[in-house]
Design a protein with these regions (language model features):
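Short secondary-structure subsegments characteristic of cysteine-rich extracellular domains
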Residues: 15-16, 23-24, 153, 192-201
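Active-site activation/catalytic loop segments of kinase-like enzymes and analogous catalytic loops
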Residues: 97, 105-156, 168-184
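Phosphate/pyrophosphate-binding loops and the adjoining catalytic core of nucleotide-dependent enzymes
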Residues: 20-34, 136, 144-152, 162-164
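Aromatic-acidic/polar surface patches that form glycan- and anion
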Residues: 8, 12, 76-77, 113-116, ...
């Protein structure tokens, strides 16, 4: 959406906030008792176990981020699981958004339950860290990352650092999945290593 159109800063703010509010209102509600009972084990699989299995670089930093995200994760009734703007359609004629390709699982749980932090970190890896640019070469306007940062601080001030750092973590843990393109893997590896070094200073 942002990569292919001339778009004003106010529209960028509006669209990102619209997605955040939609998730808070329609997805990230109170989880069922059944889902909550096994939440910690499933959250550990999503954050810590997956990180240890896939991580190939800056391991100390990103293992620490994974543990922080696990500590802050809270169960919700529904999450998307792959929430980036490539999976979001906006219809300007009726001001509606459509979410595509939800994950449908969380750890060993099959269904819509999850944690809100994972969804927000997925947005972070796209809007703040530029996942789409790393993969496709299509760069978002610079204002997108600033707008996202501002809105995270507005709606999620207590987990701001986890959302921003967690976005980089999700890039780091998907590098292995891009085995079909070594150049892309190297771009991603360079990015997450540079991010870890700059944050750790």
């Amino acid at each position: 959406m942002f990569a292919h159109e001339e778009i004003s800063n106010s529209t960028i703010d509006y669209l990102i906030e619209k997605v955040i509010l939609a998730m808070r209102t329609h997805f990230h509600g109170k989880a069922t008792l059944e889902f909550t009972a096994d939440f910690h084990d499933n959250a550990e699989k999503m954050w810590v176990n997956k990180t240890s299995e896939r991580l190939t670089c800056s391991k100390d930093f990103y293992n620490g981020v994974a543990q922080r995200c696990l500590d802050k994760a809270e169960p919700v009734s529904a999450m998307h699981g792959d929430l980036h703007f490539g999976n979001i359609l906006y219809n300007p004629y009726n001001d509606s958004i459509t979410l595509l390709d939800p994950r449908g699982s969380y750890g060993d749980h099959v269904g819509c339950g999850g944690d809100y932090l994972y969804d927000m970190c997925k947005l972070s890896h796209d809007l703040y860290h530029g996942y789409s640019e790393l993969v496709t070469g299509n760069k978002y306007p610079d204002y997108v990352s600033w707008s996202f940062s501002k809105l995270v601080d507005k709606y999620y001030p207590t987990v701001y650092n986890e959302i921003i750092d967690g976005g980089a973590l999700l890039i780091a843990t998907c590098i292995k999945l891009h085995y079909d393109c070594p150049d892309r893997q190297q771009r991603m590896k360079d990015y997450v290593n540079d991010y870890a070094k700059n944050i750790s200073r």
